[in-house]
Amino acid sequence: MTAKKIYFASDFHLGAPNYKDSISREKKIVEWLSEIQVDASELYLVGDVFDFWFEWKHAVPKGYVRILGKLAEMCDQGIPIHFFTGNHDLWTFGYLEKEIGLKIHREPVEVNLQNKLFYIGHGDGLGIGDAKYKVPKKVFTNKTCQWLFSRLHPNFSFGLAN
């Protein structure tokens, strides 16, 4: 019997730079997920799976049905999937947890995996310096700013994000 494996991936940036390239990349990612599904004990998605993701109360971004379906299937199969928010997909407010089954992490975590200690996180804004990014990140993660942004129509919001 072969040991189960733990997989890590990040920075798919689905949705960019255009529909054709994104859908092609999404299909390849889903193919890879199907391959690892047979021996995965856990999957860590370490940020920027989507180039832009924002959940409204009654709407989520259109598209991504292939990857979302595959991730839901893997969760239903009992494979824990850890989704670390990145600087492009940090606006998750329950959909990915409730409907897909992902475990959302908004901050880096220390975790012991197979008797080895790992520090896992997307990495954006963690180092000293990088003030040009840390200030906007405070705005992006501010609850009031998120609430205000959620009042914008998704068509306008996506245009603004791009």
How would you label these PLM feature ranges?
Residues 2-5, 9, 14-113:
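Core catalytic region of metal-dependent phosphoesterases/phosphodiesterases
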Residues 8, 117-121:
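Short hydrophobic-aromatic micro-motifs
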Residues 18, 87, 112-115, 142, ...:
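Detector for Asparagine
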Residues 31-32, 69, 116, 143-144, ...:
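Short, intrinsically disordered/low-complexity patches at protein termini
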Residues 123-162:
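Active-site-proximal loop/helix segment associated with metal-binding centers of metalloenzymes
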Residues 90-94, 120-121, 127-130:
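Short, well-ordered, mixed-charge alpha-helical segments that flank or form enzyme active sites
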